[in-house]
């Protein structure tokens, strides 16, 4: 009994001692707002020697085609673009005659890393289907950097990806923008300064998941009620924090609102820090989501899948909302039936921000061919779509959807040197990416397999130390 009393007294003493550790000199607690970026990028540009690409045929990602043009790369950036650039400092030259150059391709809808290969249930980490609203979860905490699918996408010229949670929930959580580079940690892949995103989902998926459990939502009206309830709570949470921070000098920390990870993400959307990426197929539901965003004062950055985008293309253009679409994937469920192959071309023709995506670990390897299919469909119906314009769907327009248009998506002076050299016309089924640079460093070379990372999984099961440097 004496030992128990002694332990009790010691524990009380330690509690009293450490309870004062957070106090300032005046006896009050330190006032701190929630950290908006608790898991910052640790990505570092890989050092490389400056080099000069000569005599290239370039699709610049902005809708232009440049002939016999040179690109000077230095310190991870595009330093100069022009004809017959002089090499006054003996930079390494790459003769790009008879080849094509494009910006690195951008896929704004991927689940690689959260649905990693091999596709076992143990690797199914993309849908936190335990509540219709899970804004508190972050895709980056599920990403496995060792997913062997990343290297396959790199071989297809994809240099930047938005990794999203799945669409089983009304509000599924935060997405993360990654550079397609080898890394032990996901933070080593995170694109520095990229805005966070929020995945929302319309339609069949949430009502199917929770309706099967006799929960709300089980209908589309239940979907809308669920979103609105969450945004009402978020507005109240934001107001509580605004009131506290605006008057924090007069209030002790004990009066600060209790932190809520779910509400913090939604508050970030309301403050414009987090971009909404909204899975939505039907035209009528897209308009409903736009109306709701105006009700609560947030902005939708992009609709994803957007099967019926062609029906509301002028509205998307007016609202400044990107439409992220497949070339010809449709009909796999009821809400995906009313699709036309000219969808992307028609949205682009209306002046909206048209973007192509994969949502698939196979299609991402051939995103250039997906662009070609969508371009051909538009051309057949009489729209004037050049290959240079179509490329914007996976370059500058995609960069806009990520909020990174000032850094990637085009061959321009000052942009990141994310560049793909193709061994032929990028839209030919016979063409492959020959070299892929990210921030000026070569990460893929079709003629030098040692350049490209090999995922640990692809090495097979080895004895410790076997066949390892």
Explain the meaning of each model-derived region.
Residues 1-10:
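Bacterial N-terminal signal peptides that target proteins for export
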Residues 56, 71, 76, 98, ...:
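Divalent metal-coordination and catalytic microenvironments
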Residues 149, 154-302, 432, 438, ...:
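Polyanionic/metal-chelating signatures
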Residues 41-42, 117-118, 124-130, 134-137, ...:
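His/Asp/Glu-enriched, well-ordered alpha-helical/loop segment
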Residues 56, 400, 412-456:
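C-terminal cap of metal-dependent C-N hydrolases
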Residues 35-36, 40-48, 58, 62-102:
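Histidine-rich, glycine-flanked metal-binding segment
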Residues 18-20:
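C-terminal motif of bacterial Sec signal peptides marking the signal peptidase cleavage site
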């Amino acid at each position: 009994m004496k030992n128990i009393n002694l332990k009790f007294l010691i524990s009380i003493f330690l509690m009293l001692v450490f309870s004062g550790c957070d106090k300032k000199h005046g006896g009050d607690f330190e006032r701190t707002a929630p950290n908006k970026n608790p898991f910052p990028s640790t990505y570092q540009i890989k050092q490389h020697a400056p080099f000069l690409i000569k005599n290239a045929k370039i699709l610049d990602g902005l809708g232009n085609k440049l002939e016999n043009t040179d690109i000077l790369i230095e310190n991870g950036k595009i330093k100069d673009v022009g004809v017959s650039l002089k090499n006054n400092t003996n930079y390494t030259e790459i003769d790009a005659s008879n080849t094509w150059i494009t910006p690195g391709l951008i896929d704004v809808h991927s689940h690689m890393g959260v649905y990693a290969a091999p596709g076992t249930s143990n690797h199914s980490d993309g849908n936190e289907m335990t509540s219709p609203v899970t804004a508190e979860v972050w895709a980056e905490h599920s990403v496995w950097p060792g997913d062997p699918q990343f290297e396959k996408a790199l071989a297809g010229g994809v240099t930047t990806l938005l990794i999203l949670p799945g669409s089983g929930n009304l509000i599924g959580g935060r997405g993360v923008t990654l550079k397609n580079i080898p890394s032990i940690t996901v933070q080593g892949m995170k694109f520095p300064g990229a805005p966070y995103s929020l995945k929302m989902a319309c339609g069949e998926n949430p009502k199917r998941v929770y309706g099967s459990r006799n929960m709300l939502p089980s209908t589309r009206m239940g979907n809308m009620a669920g979103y609105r309830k969450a945004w009402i709570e978020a507005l109240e949470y934001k107001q509580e924090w605004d009131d506290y921070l605006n008057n924090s000098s007069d209030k002790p920390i004990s009066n600060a609102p209790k932190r809520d990870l779910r509400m913090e993400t939604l508050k970030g959307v309301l403050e414009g820090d987090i971009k909404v990426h909204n899975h939505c197929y039907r035209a009528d539901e897209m308009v409903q989501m736009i109306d709701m965003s105006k009700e609560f004062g947030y902005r939708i950055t992009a609709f994803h899948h957007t099967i019926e985008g062609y029906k509301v293309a002028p509205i998307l253009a007016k609202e400044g909302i990107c439409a992220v679409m497949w070339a010809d994937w449709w009909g796999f469920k009821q809400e995906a039936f009313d699709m036309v192959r000219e969808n992307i071309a028609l949205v682009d023709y209306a002046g909206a921000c048209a973007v192509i995506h994969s949502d698939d670990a196979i299609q991402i390897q051939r995103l250039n061919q997906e662009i070609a299919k969508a371009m051909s469909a538009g051309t057949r119906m009489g729209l004037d779509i050049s290959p240079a314009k179509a490329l914007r769907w996976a370059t500058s327009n995609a960069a806009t959807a990520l909020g990174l248009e000032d850094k990637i998506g085009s061959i321009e002076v000052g942009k990141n040197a994310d560049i793909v050299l193709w061994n032929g016309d990028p839209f030919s089924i016979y063409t492959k990416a020959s070299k892929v640079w990210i921030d000026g460093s070569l990460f893929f070379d079709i003629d030098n397999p040692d350049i490209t990372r090999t995922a640990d999984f692809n090495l097979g099961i080895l004895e410790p130390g076997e066949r390892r440097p």
